[in-house]
Amino acid sequence: RWEALVDQVISDIEQQFPLQQVIGLGHSFGSLLTLMAAYKKPQLFSQVIIMDPPFVIGSKAFLFEALQKLGSKSIEKLTPAAVTVKRRDHWESIEQASQALRPNRIFKDFDEQCFADFIACGLKSDSTRNGVTLTIPKHTEAEIFRTVPAWWWRTPRKAPDIPIHVLTAKDSHFYKQ
């Protein structure tokens, strides 16, 4: 699944910016995809900026990979997957979704325009249940969390010859690792 998503990032860049390099910018899951795309096709990027990447490193990576291969349910507790599948994913209207999501700890500090952009892009019409739902189904998102590539960081490869900047908040889970 991850390789297909990396290929999608590459394809989007090649289609939208065919004659120029881009600055790769990603947060969390997007940062890891952007970095993986830069390793795969460095000529597309002038530099990469990744924020709070979900790296699984060190001894945790070995354990994480073993649990993945064994199909262990423990992965649910080590990733946001368990919370994701329990999350509400349907509202009667965009307005109801906006009112329900705004106080959430993830969104409460979002800039107004950023939150409006999330609502515009993160929700879609749900004709099956009448109303709106998440653009990316929660079960798809959970599967992505379950399959974070722990092995990727130990695979030998030449680093791209471009600047790569890693930003992380002091309070973030990734910084504390």
Question: Whereabouts are the PLM-identified features?
Answer:
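Conserved serine/cysteine hydrolase catalytic core
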Residues: 113-177
